[in-house]
């Protein structure tokens, strides 16, 4: 059923995502100070894109060209690395042109609010005297000019630092040289002056550019400009893994040093840059002219963070989002006790991470707790979570911390924390040679009179107090013994570098994540073919996995209504007639960064819902250790379903994909209420901390294909929960004439079953006859397959390849 017309290139899709971020920099519904923050986010996103994605593509293109090898083509749009690079550059140039326009407009509006940027081309005599004196006393003494000529080599240009470039006239006729002044990132970038009742701000690089003649001499300068280099940062960790006797931290530290000197991938210059200066820089940096971007806005927009901090300090609340803080539980709330009654789901940033931190601290001091185990991917600079682990170790408990040192751009922070954890007495492990451990898993083990009890936490987001207030994520906490035992196995396998399929209720990539989700999709497809109103709602950050995309196409053609909420990369086109016409995709980009992953499957009778740390990117499904879990508590199933429905009704932050792959902003129809899927969460989760009735899964029984009507009604009602103030149960309207009526029930009525189904499948007796599958979640488990990590480089990948089912 493969059809190339449904695919979108990964890199071009990412640029479309950054376009959606950039669009918030001009959105009138976004307060002005928040608009300029989005411009800064757009810029930092683009920096990272060039450092990682473009850097990787460039290396691949160079390798294929140098070795005259057959070019490797991307498996969806069939593009080579060189073709992808050729498509990226003009699209980036258009984005930058838009950014320049939005920036100019933002400056006008900031000036109208009393914050004016200094224009060094139009200084009054008084201002000229002030800034010249400031330059001479504060900046001139710390500048380090360099001349590039036959006696002075071209200096190394640091990644993402701004430089002043000056074309100089030599004494000999027609001779020229290049002068370079680093504008160190250690310098104070913004300088503020109060004048005429307003705050003026100046960028240090523009100040140095204006007074360049004070350094080189006015008669010598032919041309001057500012420029900035972006370097490849896609380090290959495997290169340093040949010697297993070397400490892994030392390897990563050395690789980080090496990364600073990788090849240049982009050159940004200001409009004053003469062609000769651009040519000289490209020659020295070995860059194509197609990698030069001339921009009218500052080369680094991160100064907006400091500017908005100044605005906030001077009390201009109207320029910012209204204050919104994570909701705290009642003063007597104890998560350790609450989770003994029923499963708990925390939703960040709407609910505070504080109860989870308090639970860790309590465990660290509880004499009956014997161990705490946790996977750590990105941690805060000042982490109370890590401090709790260290306290537990100092109190004599076994603490195992799996620290992923390869968390990109957080490597040094993780190296530093791993040393502190080790010094505190924790057992620190680093996971696999070939796989990043991206899972968010915590296990607290407690000794009891009759054995052991567990508290397990499985999340979609990092253990990071800072980002828990900025990213939307979900944290599932349970005292379920079966899940605790499986989590214990996961940690045991991680400690000895093994992968296993031995899990019933947890999803653990790479061996048992994608396969389970594909099986769930097959069940829904079979239900649709039987005429049931089957549907799926899939929320994550990105999708690129070809197997999953093709399965979504199959589901759409079978009449399954599919709603996807995909914030970022999306390599599948929605609503393509005859192919994905029942697939509807929207992206939410707003105040908070959407980061949670929820996968909901409705077979026309029952809803089965999962949360997980992994997206639908191929790297998540096949190349990382991810952890997910099916949520079975009826109250939590309803809560997650309500969250999904709220986001499907969002007409503030949402943009919907069209059949050509473009996105259109969703606007409320006439008379339709405004629904903000993010801010509506505060109402949805209000008074959500406790409930009267406990819930525990019952012992699993062989269930009939259809439960009696009265029994289903009782199960569907479940424990009582507060009805959210925001109406979240209204189904989205059908979209156009191609809409298939059989799939029109999304969001379908939810049937909540308190019965435990540990094998991952239930109520599918009729459906299984229609599925050409050798192994379904509710059938007897296959024999355990264990893959042992390699002793030599490369063997791990070879062995794992024997067990991968789909390519």
Protein language model annotation of sequence segments:
Residues 546:
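Active-site glycine- and acidic-residue-rich loops that bind
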Residues 1-536, 554, 558, 570-592, ...:
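N-terminal localization/anchoring segments of enzymes in phospholipid and broader phosphate metabolism
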Residues 561-565:
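Hydrophobic alpha/beta core scaffold segments
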């Amino acid at each position: 059923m493969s059809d190339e017309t449904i695919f979108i290139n990964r890199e071009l899709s990412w640029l479309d995502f950054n376009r959606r971020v950039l669009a918030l920099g001009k959105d009138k519904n976004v307060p002005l100070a928040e608009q300029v923050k989005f411009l800064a986010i757009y810029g930092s996103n683009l920096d990272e894109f060039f450092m990682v994605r473009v850097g990787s593509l460039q290396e691949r293109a160079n390798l294929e060209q140098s070795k005259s090898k057959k070019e490797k083509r991307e498996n969806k749009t069939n593009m080579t690395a060189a073709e992808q690079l050729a498509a990226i550059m003009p699209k980036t140039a258009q984005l930058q042109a838009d950014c320049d326009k939005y920036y100019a407009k933002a400056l006008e509006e900031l000036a109208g609010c009393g914050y004016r940027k200094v224009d060094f081309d139009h200084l009054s005599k008084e201002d000229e005297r002030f800034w010249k004196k400031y330059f001479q006393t504060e900046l001139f003494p710390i500048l380090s000019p360099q001349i590039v000529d036959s006696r002075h080599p071209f200096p190394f240009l640091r990644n993402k630092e701004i430089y002043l470039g000056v074309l100089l006239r030599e004494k000999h006729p027609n001779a020229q040289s290049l002068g370079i002044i680093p504008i160190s990132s250690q310098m104070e970038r913004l300088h503020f002056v109060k004048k005429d009742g307003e705050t003026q701000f100046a960028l240090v690089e523009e100040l140095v550019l204006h007074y360049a003649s004070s350094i080189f001499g006015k008669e010598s300068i032919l041309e001057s400009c500012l420029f900035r280099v972006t370097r490849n940062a896609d380090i290959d960790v495997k290169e340093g893994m040949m010697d297993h006797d070397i400490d892994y931290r030392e390897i990563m530290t050395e690789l980080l040093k090496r990364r600073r000197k990788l090849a240049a991938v982009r050159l940004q210059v200001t409009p004053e840059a003469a062609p000769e200066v651009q040519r000289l820089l490209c020659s020295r940096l070995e860059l194509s002219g197609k990698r030069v971007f001339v921009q009218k806005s500052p080369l680094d927009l991160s100064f907006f963070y400091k500017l908005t901090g100044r605005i906030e300090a001077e009390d201009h609340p109207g320029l910012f989002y209204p204050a919104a803080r994570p909701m705290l539980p009642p003063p007597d709330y104890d998560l350790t006790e609450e989770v003994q009654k029923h499963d708990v789901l925390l939703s960040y940033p709407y609910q505070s991470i504080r109860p989870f931190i308090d639970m860790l601290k309590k465990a660290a001091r509880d004499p009956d707790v014997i161990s705490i185990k946790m996977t750590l991917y990105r941690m805060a600079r000042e982490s109370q979570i890590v401090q709790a682990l260290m306290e537990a170790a100092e109190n004599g408990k076994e603490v195992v911390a799996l620290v992923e040192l390869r968390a990109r751009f957080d490597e040094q922070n993780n190296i530093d924390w791993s040393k502190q954890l080790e010094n505190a007495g924790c057992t620190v492990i680093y996971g696999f040679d070939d796989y990043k451990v991206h899972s968010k898993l915590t296990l607290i083990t407690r000794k009891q009179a009759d054995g052991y009890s567990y508290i397990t936490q499985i999340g979609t987001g990092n253990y990071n107090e800072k980002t828990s207030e900025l990213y939307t994520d979900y944290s599932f906490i349970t005292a379920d013994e079966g899940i605790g035992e499986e989590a214990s196995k996961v940690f045991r396998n991680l400690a000895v570098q093994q992968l296993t399929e031995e899990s019933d209720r947890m999803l653990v990539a790479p061996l048992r994540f994608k396969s389970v989700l594909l099986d769930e999709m097959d069940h829904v497809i079979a239900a649709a073919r039987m005429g049931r109103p089957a549907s799926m709602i899939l929320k994550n950050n990105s999708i690129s996995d070809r197997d999953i995309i093709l399965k979504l196409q199959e589901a759409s053609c079978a009449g399954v209504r599919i709603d996807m909420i995909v914030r970022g990369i999306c390599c599948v086109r929605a609503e393509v007639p005859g192919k994905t016409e029942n697939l509807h995709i929207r992206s939410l980009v707003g105040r908070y960064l959407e980061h949670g992953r929820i996968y909901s499957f409705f077979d026309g009778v029952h809803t089965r819902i999962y949360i997980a740390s992994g997206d639908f990117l191929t790297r998540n499904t096949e190349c990382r250790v991810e952890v997910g879990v099916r949520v079975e508590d009826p109250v939590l199933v309803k809560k997650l379903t309500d969250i999904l429905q709220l986001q499907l009704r969002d007409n503030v932050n949402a943009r919907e994909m069209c059949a050509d792959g473009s996105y259109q902003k969703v606007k409320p129809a006439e008379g339709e209420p405004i629904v903000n899927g993010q801010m509506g969460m505060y109402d949805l989760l209000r008074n959500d901390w406790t409930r009267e009735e406990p819930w525990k899964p019952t012992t699993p029984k062989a269930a009939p294909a259809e439960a009696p009507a009265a029994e289903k009604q009782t199960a569907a009602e479940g424990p009582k929960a507060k009805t959210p103030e925001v109406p979240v149960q209204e189904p989205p309207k059908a979209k156009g004439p191609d809409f298939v009526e059989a799939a029109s029930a999304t969001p379908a009525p939810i049937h909540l079953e308190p019965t435990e189904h540990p094998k991952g499948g239930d109520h599918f007796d009729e459906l299984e006859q229609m599925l050409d599958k050798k192994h379904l979640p509710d059938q007897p488990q296959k024999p355990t397959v264990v893959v042992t990590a390699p002793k030599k480089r490369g063997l791990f990948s070879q062995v794992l390849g024997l067990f991968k089912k789909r390519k």
